[in-house]
Amino acid sequence: MDPYAVIMKPHVTEKSMNLIDQNNELAFVVMRKSTKKDVRRAFEELFAVKVERVNTQVTPRGQKIAYIKLAKEHSAEDIAVKLGVF
């Protein structure tokens, strides 16, 4: 799958901002059909970082949100700044 098709946009909420600071974790809205492996591959390819784990959640509105935890050697804050989240 095309990485740009899998990862659609950052999911910016109060909870996701706390996850960036406390857990080195980012939240993204992803394509509904994508799997955790698809999200991991796409994120590692787009941002050149190592992903520790991916958790997904489908909201009542039908959006799929992926919570992506980065390895300790990479900073979620740096990626958030590059994306303009902060």
From Swiss-Prot:
This is Large ribosomal subunit protein uL23. One of its GO terms (cellular component) is ribonucleoprotein complex. Part of the 50S ribosomal subunit. Contacts protein L29. GO terms for biological process: translation. It holds the Pfam family Ribosomal_L23. GO terms for molecular function: rRNA binding; structural constituent of ribosome. Belongs to the universal ribosomal protein uL23 family. InterPro entries: Nucleotide-bd_a/b_plait_sf, Ribosomal_uL23, Ribosomal_uL23-like, Ribosomal_uL23/eL15/eS24_sf. Keywords: Ribonucleoprotein, Ribosomal protein, RNA-binding, rRNA-binding. It comes from the Archaea. Coiled coil: none annotated. Binds to 23S rRNA. One of the proteins that surrounds the polypeptide exit tunnel on the outside of the ribosome.
